[in-house]
Curated annotation (Swiss-Prot):
<dbReference type="InterPro" id="IPR020624">
    <property type="entry name" value="Schiff_base-form_aldolases_CS"/>
</dbReference>
<dbReference type="InterPro" id="IPR013785">
    <property type="entry name" value="Aldolase_TIM"/>
</dbReference>
<feature type="binding site">
    <location>
        <position position="203"/>
    </location>
    <ligand>
        <name>pyruvate</name>
    </ligand>
</feature>
<feature type="site" description="Part of a proton relay during catalysis">
    <location>
        <position position="43"/>
    </location>
</feature>
<dbReference type="GO" id="GO:0019877">
    <property type="term" value="P:diaminopimelate biosynthetic process"/>
</dbReference>
<keyword id="KW-0456">Lyase</keyword>
<comment type="similarity">
    <text>Belongs to the DapA family.</text>
</comment>
<feature type="active site" description="Schiff-base intermediate with substrate">
    <location>
        <position position="161"/>
    </location>
</feature>
<keyword id="KW-0028">Amino-acid biosynthesis</keyword>
<keyword id="KW-0220">Diaminopimelate biosynthesis</keyword>
<dbReference type="Pfam" id="PF00701">
    <property type="entry name" value="DHDPS"/>
</dbReference>
<comment type="pathway">
    <text>Amino-acid biosynthesis; L-lysine biosynthesis via DAP pathway; (S)-tetrahydrodipicolinate from L-aspartate: step 3/4.</text>
</comment>
<dbReference type="InterPro" id="IPR005263">
    <property type="entry name" value="DapA"/>
</dbReference>
<keyword id="KW-0457">Lysine biosynthesis</keyword>
<protein>
    <recommendedName>
        <fullName>4-hydroxy-tetrahydrodipicolinate synthase</fullName>
        <ecNumber>4.3.3.7</ecNumber>
    </recommendedName>
</protein>
<dbReference type="GO" id="GO:0005829">
    <property type="term" value="C:cytosol"/>
</dbReference>
<keyword id="KW-0963">Cytoplasm</keyword>
Length: 293
């Protein structure tokens, strides 16, 4: 269930609220285009600016709109363990298929603190947990040994979204666990290199815009057809880089609006609209790929 091309879905807003109509359209779009799973309320979904009740409602909406046609992985991590447990229990009750759990951010726990945080969540819930290691945002790196300990101790800890930018981490974590461990790239530009050494797929930003091709690339890689997969990787390299010319999800949400995938470009402060010169660069790249006119 948790392999291949999984989209880190944007959250559409309109008039200060979650835009149900656009959200349903996005989920239908990904079902139609062959996306393997949806992460809802993750970093790309602006989870940090959702209220607790909005967070719960967004997950419930996604489960409802997916209607068991595509797995829903709910972003329910937090830097307060009790909050992460509450959100995860709520997602489990709503019918989510899995949970994405970010390493606690800002408070910079030790490796033992990270272990105890995820231990508490794993013991209080039964939903499959995918841990999320992104030190550039959290300020702390969950080491492979800490992940391996959690993976060994708790059967509902099934994998990790790895976003350190270090491809060698894949081999290291497999050596500490087993080849079946679910390792997912957290960086579109590193998806293919990571899958070449054993990762199972990606939680992708670019998938918001080109889901069919990202899904095909991942399927080819899982089948060992790396030369064919590399052709897709090379084709979209420029898009992968352009989607990070400003803080994610600002460029991808702007692109989705320009492509007509959502009805409003609205973002929540402190995220703000793109600089005009960067938006022009984004438009140029989207035109090059035939995504807008």
């Amino acid at each position: 269930m948790f392999k291949g091309s999984i989209v880190a879905l944007i959250t559409p807003f309109k008039d200060g609220a979650i835009d149900r109509k656009s959200l349903k359209r996005l989920i239908d779009f990904h079902v139609e285009k062959g996306t393997d799973g949806i992460v809802i309320a993750g970093t790309t979904g602006e989870s940090a600016t959702l209220t607790f009740s909005e967070h719960e409602d967004l997950i419930k909406m996604a489960v409802e709109f997916a209607d068991k046609r595509i797995p829903i992985i709910a972003g329910t991590g937090a830097n307060a363990t009790h909050e992460a447990i509450a959100l995860t229990k709520s997602a489990e009750k709503a019918g989510a298929d899995g949970s994405l759990q970010i390493v606690p951010y800002y408070n910079k726990p030790t490796q033992e603190g990270i272990y105890q945080h995820f231990k508490a969540i794993a013991e209080e819930t039964s939903i499959p947990l995918i841990l999320y290691n992104i030190p550039s945002r959290t300020g702390v790196d969950m080491l492979p040994e800490t992940f391996a300990r959690l993976y060994s101790d708790f059967p509902n800890v099934i994998g990790i979204k790895e976003a350190t930018g270090n491809v060698a981490r894949v081999s290291e974590m497999i050596s500490l666990t087993n080849p079946d461990v679910v390792i997912l790239s957290g960086d579109d530009a590193l998806t293919l290199p990571m899958m070449a050494v054993g990762a199972k797929g990606v939680i992708s930003v670019a998938n918001n815009l080109v889901p069919e091709d990202i899904a095909t690339m991942c399927r080819l890689a899982l089948e060992g057809r790396f030369e064919e997969a590399r052709q897709i990787h090379d084709r979209y390299w420029k898009l992968f880089k352009t989607l990070f010319i400003e803080t994610n999800p600002i460029p991808v949400k702007t692109a989705a609006y320009l492509m007509g995938l959502i009805d409003d470009i609205e973002m929540r402060l402190p995220l703000y609209y793109m600089k005009p010169e960067n938006e022009e660069k984004l438009k140029s790249v989207l035109k090059d790929y035939g995504l807008i006119r």
